Amino acid sequence: MAAGWGPKLQGRLAEYAKMKDTVLLGSIQKHMMREADKPSDRRQDIIHPSEMAKTGWCPRGTYLRIKACREADNPYLKPKENIGVQLLNIFDEGHYIHDKWQRRLWAMGELWGRFICPACDTDHVNYVSPKFCDNCGLSWEHMVYKEIALRALDPYLIAGHADGGVPSKRALIEIKSVGAGTVRVSDPELYKKYSQGQMVDLPGLWKAIETPFPDHVNQGQLYLAICQLMGYDFDKIVFLYESKFNQGAKEFVVDYDPKHSAPLLDSAYAINRALQGLTDPPVCPHNGCTDCEGKDYGTTITEGVGSAGEASPSRATNTRPTRRLRSTGPTRKLGGVPAR
């Protein structure tokens, strides 16, 4: 039989075929795939800020996903994804980069958020860099940081997590690992300038990044808007970029602008109302895309409901008091006094 006869294996089938010739690597990669295939613990019945922030976000696709979750009575319902080992490695590397920057801020006494003790399961919420578990005394080096939960479920149905907060700077932090693929997706023109075919000028590409990418700014502004709704006193977000190819680091600071995220909040509000049957489902901004037509959510859409004409709350002025972050002794927590 001639070499190369038959269809070329692609995706996971190709990866499985390569694994047969390894001593250890193949077993590790199979383990990675099995772990990735386990049911996700990430809620799919809410709107994620990270999806809203993308330039090509399809509100209709988000609507369909949440509607399917409700019909199945399963908040974790998600179409099966065949993620390859290379992409799994990319995800893991991003997690490691997040962890090291968060732990540096923790060691400095600057990191605010939620901390878990794995020894006794004590939940430390709204703490600043605890040095030990309040319940069992476990040292902070063995505790786990669970970031900052951000919720705007009513009326926006939005829920997510910020990478951290630094009260002394009144700043949220967002940590981004940046590789050639990041730039290719986030700033195609910049990528094109420093690439030729498969060849990429990585040092030049990294040096040329002088502002945070638009999708990242969208995400950060959404986080800050939700902080205002929750009463958290953060007025800026600091982006920490780390280069995947040479571990270089950059910082970008973006001040809160309520006008920036208002259209996204309007879209989230419209999705929530459509899910309640109060208005029509959102239309696809791309006249059909993989998010709304390329995924089988197993749900149906009722059109022609019309709009109740109620304005989005994002157009109203937020009059809620803001809680300041202040010191309360050996372990600093979130204070309850209004700002200004």
Which positions does each model-derived feature cover?
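Metal-dependent nuclease catalytic regions and adjoining charged, substrate-binding loops involved
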Residues: 4, 10-17, 127, 185, ...
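Metal-dependent nuclease catalytic cores that hydrolyze phosphodiester bonds in DNA/RNA
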Residues: 1-172, 179-199, 317-328, 334-337
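Long, contiguous hydrophobic alpha-helical segments, chiefly transmembrane helices and signal peptides
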Residues: 158-162, 175, 216-222
